[in-house]
Amino acid sequence: MKQIEQLIEISRKYGQDSRFVIAGGGNTSYKDDERLWVKASGHALATITEDGFAVLDREKMNIISTKQYSTNSSEREAEATEDLMAACITKGRKPSVEASLHNAMSAPFIVHLHPTLINGLMSSVDVEAQTSRLFGDEVLYVPYSDPGYALYMKVSQAIAQYVANKGHEPQVILLQNHGIFVGADTIQEIEAIYDRVLSTIEHAISAPLPEGEAEISDLVSEVVPAIRMMVSRDGESRTLKVQNSQLIEWFAQSQEHFDKVSGPFSPDSGIYCNSKYIYISADSVDAILSEAEQKIEEYKSSNGYDPKVILIKGIGLVCVGRNAKECGIVEDVYLDMMKIAWYAQSFGGEHPMTPEQRLFVDNWEAHRPKFKTAGNGRVENKIFIVTGAAQGFGEGIAKCLIREGANIVVADLNEERGGITTAELNRMASGNKAIFAKCNITDPESIKALIKSTVCAFGGLDVFVSNAGIARAGDLETMSIENFELMTKINYNAYFLCTKAASRVMKLQNRYNAENWGDIIQINSKSGLRGSKANFAYAGSKFGGIGLTQSFALELAPYRIKVNSICPGNFYDGPLWSDPVNGLFVQYLNAGKVPGAKSVEDVKEYYLSQSPMRKGCAPADVCKAVLYLIEQTCETGQALPITGGQTMLN
């Protein structure tokens, strides 16, 4: 059907433009005399297909306008929703809660959005006078109404009055603290109307938005992990995201500026970000933590739930979510609120929703987003850093963990390969997420930046997997001092540097949550359990790693941080062994490590014969060990072999 194709076209056009759609807000429709196609709940405008539209019987919908409902607002909304669902022909698709508003306008195509610029006007003190000044009687302005049935009836009555006065319906309806409806015969007309409305408002803005990023203070690593624990004391870990910009910095610089964004401007902002937010003005670590703990406890006590938005002077915007996806939505919506507040200054100042209006939205079940709270992954919402995760064992471990609900930081020097791996991980993720962080694990400053990136992306650190390592085979005659020192630096020294940095975050978290545990897991080797001929430099670095593991475990146990090593057998399919130029099969052949071996296949057969199970070790095997070590709370300082029986502990 041509009209539905056009509806999809215009839906995607605006849905993919963040100036018009934030967090999936807004909806579109097409109607003929008998039926209405309207965006179904749970479908994004940006990617919508024909299956994303609910189809309704307009005759049955019209009953809603004349039927008498309960005077109790909750009961009334439930009754009206029931009638709306009864009109739905496509029973598997729930129509938008605003479907009745689309039906109230007679134009075939309707596009309802919440554009930032328009809501700067709609959420201003002088909204009615300024709307009249800018548009005259070209548009229909409707003062705020609670969403749902009440809004539908108010708009219907306003349309009827407009028709009585003007002799025709309005093409544009502007809703206070809500957004805009545009109706027309064609999608081209709708596009032209939107362009005209936005251009008119844009020319009335007296000061442009502050542009550009702003630095996030290094204090973030000493503050935000503790705040994460303050909002995670119910046994379910939260994800936090930290962002800063010139715009955020302006609103965070004082209580006066924060007050301009201290309440929601629309139902959506109240739904996604809650109706109240926290501002912290302290400027030292101890003072910030003290103020945060006090205000978060007060917030929970008075509201019955955790805050989703915390603005910290000198640090930036901290968003709280049940997973990384929700955190990103909270960030998008609150940043949009900041822009709305800024634009509103051109129209007399900001006008947030009243306490009574917020209360209705807080209790409005019909439109509350059904976020996935907790998945069934074994490490759901835990935060991992995996070094050397761009490829090989690290990549395999990261892929296993992302399937189990983990948030992953791919820490590696290889930016190109790391970016590819991170993209693959995110395609596998659901509510969780992966990011790439370029890191040189032998450089303390690079590790410090890695920790900061992790805290900003996810709010803290639960598990550090020290996986990055190198192997250079050689006997006493052929091993160079340069190769020996390089292996020691990467396989041994870096483990110390990473543990030092990671344990600081874990100590801080556990100080604020008595039930929390942290894990540091070194991916060692079977060569860390027994000597390796013509491979002493590698084996020595791995033996030393187990010594560090045991010593770190003794030191960190009082802080509820477990430290363990995993000693995998040979990962024959990975680049460490199978690289045709520098792989260990080639190195061992050239070093004469396997007596009588004349080819790479001879070397491989020799190593397979060393394992009773005649198999190499795969990342999935190692990941099972990682999960075991995390889930248990009775072992630390251990070296767990995963070798198919090749190495057996005494």
Language model segments and positions:
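Active-site helix of classical SDR
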Residues: T499, S541, T549
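Glycine-rich flexible loops
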Residues: M1-F384, G396
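Alpha-helical segment proximal to the catalytic Tyr-Lys
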Residues: R504, L554-E555
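C-terminal substrate-recognition "lid" of short-chain dehydrogenase/reductases
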Residues: K615-I642
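Substrate-binding pocket helix/loop in short-chain dehydrogenase/reductase
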Residues: D475-L476, S480-E485, Y607
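Active-site loop-to-helix junction immediately N-terminal to the catalytic Tyr of the SDR YXXXK motif
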Residues: M479, G531-A539, S551
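Residue(s) in the substrate-gating loop at a strand-loop-helix junction
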Residues: S525
